[in-house]
């Protein structure tokens, strides 16, 4: 039973050390205790041999401890001596082991420590972000180094940290290897200089809210961090300045159609009462000296009164026509002549109505002479107290009337 345990322990130990040092250990034990029997040597040396086997794997100290656990002092000294010899032979025969067996574990722990140090540096930089870059309490390349060594799994957790320093933002390319971060430092320094002129809220996926405030979107932080900083600024400025102007346009478009219909009807009635045509209104708008407003066609005014224009055009035309209507009514109340408001309304000749007695006299003159001379027309106009032009036009119209009557009678 003891031999099986010894064999199992020797098989677990190094092969060279077992083959070279088993015999000297047994001879040392036999020389230390000559009176002991041969079968007692394995039983007495079993603790020391086991300790020597352990010393071959773990060091000379283990061999010494195994020797002290023996029942006799001589066997203990022999075990310690054997342990020292096996340690020396192991160092001479075995190749040199690596300097750090747990290198991977140390690198992961170092990366975590550097990540925590980077967060501490960033928190310190919050109080100094208004200083120029040469007054920064830390070197930019150190920040790039620590940020590049952060593993990819920490991107989601670290995206919610409000990093405000430009150099810390420029080092978000954490997917690069540790040995290649020196090649990217000029580009990252350039990004840091550009980001100094931007708001801290533009970084890490900051977006403008509906009320103009800056809100952070951690879910899109890795994607937004790789964007051009100027693109982020343009995007944030578009959100910050586009919303108020859009709301202003919406307030102008939000007009009640019933108000437009009521104004169009009132405008039409007032225009007819003033005796102004639609064409006169369109041409008179240029005289109001409204910026960007010229004369309009008669069809535009007609479509406005009949509500056939588009909603936006109705809204744009309403204040212009309202301004003209106020000026026209003011001129009508004050009995002032403002031809620019009516634009040639007084140039239009009114229809002449001839009374019955003058009409019968003209018909008598026409029966005698259908084509009177110019002197005869002047004498008739002076006799009937009419204008010469009125008498001339009446004779011309009467001749056309006679032609139509003869043509219809001949058919």
UniProtKB/Swiss-Prot annotation:
Q: What InterPro entries does the record point to?
A: HD, Homeobox_CS, Homeodomain-like_sf, Lambda_DNA-bd_dom_sf, POU, POU_dom, POU_domain_TF
Where is the short sequence motif Nuclear speckle targeting signal located? 173-187
Cross-referenced PROSITE patterns: HOMEOBOX_1, HOMEOBOX_2, POU_1, POU_2, POU_3
Tissue expression profile of the protein? Expressed in retinal ganglion cells (RGCs). Expressed in mature osteoclasts. Expressed in cells of layers of the superior colliculus and the adjacent periaqueductal gray (at protein level). Expressed in the brain, peripheral sensory nervous system and retina. Expressed in the optical, intermediate, and deep gray areas of the superior colliculus, the dorsal column of the mesencephalic and pontine central gray, and the lateral interpeduncular nucleus of the brain. Expressed predominantly in postmitotic, terminally differentiated neurons. Expressed in ganglion cell layer (GCL) of the retina.
Annotated Gene Ontology cellular component terms:
cytoplasm; euchromatin; nuclear speck; nucleus; transcription regulator complex
The record's annotation in Pfam families points to:
Homeodomain (PF00046), Pou (PF00157)
Q: Which domain of life is it from?
A: Eukaryota
Q: Which family does it belong to?
A: Belongs to the POU transcription factor family. Class-4 subfamily.
Question: How is this protein named in the record?
Answer: POU domain, class 4, transcription factor 2
Q: Please report the organism this UniProt entry assigns to the protein.
A: Mus musculus
């Amino acid at each position: 039973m003891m031999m099986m345990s010894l064999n199992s322990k020797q098989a677990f130990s190094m092969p060279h050390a077992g083959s070279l040092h088993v015999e000297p250990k047994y001879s040392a034990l036999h020389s230390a205790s000559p009176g002991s029997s041969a079968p007692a040597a394995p039983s007495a040396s079993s603790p020391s041999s086991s300790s020597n086997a352990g010393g071959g794997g773990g060091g000379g100290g283990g061999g010494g401890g195994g020797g002290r656990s023996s029942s006799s002092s001589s066997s203990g000294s022999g075990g310690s001596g054997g342990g020292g010899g096996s340690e020396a032979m192991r160092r001479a025969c075995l190749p040199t082991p690596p300097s750090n067996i747990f290198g991977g574990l140390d690198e992961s722990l170092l990366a975590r420590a550097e990540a925590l140090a980077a967060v501490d540096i960033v928190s310190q930089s919050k109080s100094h972000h208004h200083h120029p870059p040469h007054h920064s309490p830390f070197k930019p390349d150190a920040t790039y180094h620590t940020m590049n060594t952060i593993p990819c799994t920490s991107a989601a957790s670290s995206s919610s940290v409000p990093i405000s320093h430009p150099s810390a933002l420029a080092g978000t390319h954490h997917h690069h290897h540790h040995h290649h971060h020196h090649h990217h430092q000029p580009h990252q320094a350039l990004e840091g200089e550009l980001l100094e002129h931007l708001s801290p809220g533009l970084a890490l996926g900051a977006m403008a809210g509906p009320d103009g405030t800056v809100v952070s979107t951690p879910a899109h932080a890795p994607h937004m961090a790789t964007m051009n900083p100027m693109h982020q600024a343009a995007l944030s400025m578009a959100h910050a300045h586009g919303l108020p102007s859009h709301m202003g346009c919406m307030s102008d478009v939000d007009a009640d159609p019933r108000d437009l219909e009521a104004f169009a009807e009132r405008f039409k009635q007032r225009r007819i009462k003033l005796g102004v045509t639609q064409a006169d209104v369109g041409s008179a708008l240029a005289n109001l000296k409204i910026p960007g407003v010229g004369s309009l066609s008669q069809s535009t005014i007609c479509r406005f009164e009949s509500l056939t224009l588009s909603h936006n055009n109705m809204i744009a035309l309403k204040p212009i026509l309202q301004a003209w209507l106020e000026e026209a009514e003011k001129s009508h109340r004050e009995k002032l002549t403002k031809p620019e408001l009516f634009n040639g309304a007084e140039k239009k000749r009114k229809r002449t109505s001839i009374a019955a007695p003058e009409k019968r006299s003209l018909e008598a003159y026409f029966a005698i002479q259908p084509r009177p001379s110019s002197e005869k027309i002047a004498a008739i106009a002076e006799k009937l107290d009419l204008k010469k032009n009125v008498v001339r036009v009446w004779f011309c119209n009467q001749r056309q009337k006679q032609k139509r009557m003869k043509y219809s009678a001949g058919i």
